Amino acid sequence: MEANVFRFRDARSAPDPVLEAGPVAFGSQPVPLVLDNGSFQARAGWACPGPDPGPEPRLQFRAVCARGRGGARGGPGPQVGNALGSLEPLRWMLRSPFDRNVPVNLELQELLLDYSFQHLGVSSQGCVDHPIVLTEAVCNPLYSRQMMSELLFECYRIPKVAYGIDSLFSFYHNVPKNALSSGLIISSGYQCTHILPVLEGRLDAKNCKRINLGGSQAAGYLQRLLQLKYPGHLAAITLSRMEEILQEHSYIAEDYGAELQKWQCPDYYENNVHKMQLPFSSKLLGSTLTAEEKQERRQQQLRRLQELNARRREEKLQLDQERLERLLYVQELLEEGQMDQFHKALIELNMDSPEELQSYIQKLTLAVEQAKQKILQAEASLEVDVVDSKPETPDLEPLEPTMEDVENISDFEPLFSEETPEVEKPQVTTVQPVFNLAAYHQLSVGTERIRAPEIIFQPSLIGEEQAGIAETLHFVLDRYPKAIQDTLVQNVFLTGGNVMYPGMKARVEKELLEMRPFQSSFQVQLASNPVLDAWYGARDWALDHLEDSGAWVTRKDYEEKGGEYLKEHCASNTYVPIRLPKQASRASETQTSGRGSSASGSGAG
């Protein structure tokens, strides 16, 4: 295979095993459960105390589920996450509890939580007797938090919960814990991108900005580009494969315009294009089959057709027998003299008289007997000889040369004696056409490698009237005095699964260099693990604040202050309580109505 030809992995997830919590989760006090509730992938694990709290979350699965048909009739129930295997055959059935990055369907969210608790080995009866650290969206709506708290406290009866933002947990994991750090977080995930200023360890929610673009929109854009480029492979260009191209073959251009100019050079294109090999079959149907194989295939098709017809006959026979039993039961009602029930049954059967019932019973009995005979005949004649309909070729008559032809040949024999030199014939080389079937099933991914991830810097590429990361970053910085700007740009932090493109850090540094004053300094830091650092940070926070009652929402707080209540901490949203308009007291309303009636009475007098 060529150096720039790559095969799709088409990874298929394996079902998660049901783990055992082990003695580490049940110590002197319950160990917290850490749930990174992402819109693309959910991660769950234990915040185990000790020098080695564990390398990574025990569960990582796609935050989607699919309900199988016939679940209420004993069929397969809803499948969640890795239990789905390959997502593409089920794409039309997939459902997510999220609208963008906000959970809105709590029924599906309950399925995800059930899956997490079951596979983590939570064995407490009737409740989840562990504190929970749960991530939520930036500026999460109060209604969403209220429904989530209601689900956790009422359904799972947890002792306490702490809510936090995934990017702030990632920031908490990567910066020193001994200082109240300030910085500017650029978080880009599956559905949206956020610019989050942090001042002295707390989120400045008033100046947060959101861009409604992320990895999902980049994958959709790449899919449309390649489907327009290769309309013959429309079905093979799936979203899962586009996500694979984004994760493994795309990069961020430091200068988008200059990079496009490079791709115009044929040599640069040939050296940098990535050819994605689609699966294909090189065996042409019918071209290499022998007569015996064709005969065997015909027999298999005939046998399969016979089995299908037999199955249909049995199903029809079963239905006819059930209907016949019902009609015979109605006839017994007539014979026993239960006329009221008999007439009611006739109405349900849409019949008018006992004679019509008797006629229908006779016809149905005859049909059942005939069906049984057909089934017996079909079972007796399972072995069927398949006769080849190819006509026999008559024997060819022997072709014998006549004497006249032999004499004519002998007349020309002296002209071609052994001394006569042979005339040299010109050598004609025939070129056989070569068709590379593998090359026909290749997707050449050239400029698409930089066009798809570029949408978070230029949303206009997909027709979105939004500002990109650079413009939004400049807008947020302009809302602060110069001294605070200098403090924020000293710690620009990149996190989220959509910042893992090669060249992302260099592009942000270039944009900052263009917008900052001449010879000013700044520093850009990429998270050590942009995908898992949110879970690591939530685990670290849970261990550091396990005894801090000012950071956890207890069941008592939930019952007294409502489900939307939030205790603020260094990685949380800002709590903004619901302010309802004050209603006038009944006494003031009575006085007002009394004054109005007295005024009307004096006017009448």
Swiss-Prot record:
GO terms for biological process: chromatin remodeling; DNA recombination; DNA repair; positive regulation of DNA repair; positive regulation of DNA-templated transcription; positive regulation of telomere maintenance in response to DNA damage; regulation of cell cycle; regulation of chromosome organization. Residues 593-605 have a biased composition (Low complexity). GO terms for cellular component: Ino80 complex. Residues 581-605 are annotated as: Disordered. Residues 287-328, 355-384 form a coiled coil. It comes from the Eukaryota. There is a cross-link at K283 (Glycyl lysine isopeptide (Lys-Gly) (interchain with G-Cter in SUMO2)). It is found in: Nucleus. Keywords: Coiled coil, DNA damage, DNA recombination, DNA repair, Isopeptide bond, Nucleus, Transcription, Transcription regulation, Ubl conjugation. Component of the chromatin remodeling INO80 complex; specifically part of a complex module associated with the helicase ATP-binding domain and helicase C-terminal of INO80. Proposed core component of the chromatin remodeling INO80 complex which is involved in transcriptional regulation, DNA replication and probably DNA repair. Involved in DNA double-strand break repair and UV-damage excision repair. Belongs to the actin family. ARP5 subfamily. PANTHER family: ACTIN. This is Actin-related protein 5. It comes from Mus musculus. The lineage of its organism: Eukaryota, Metazoa, Chordata, Craniata, Vertebrata.
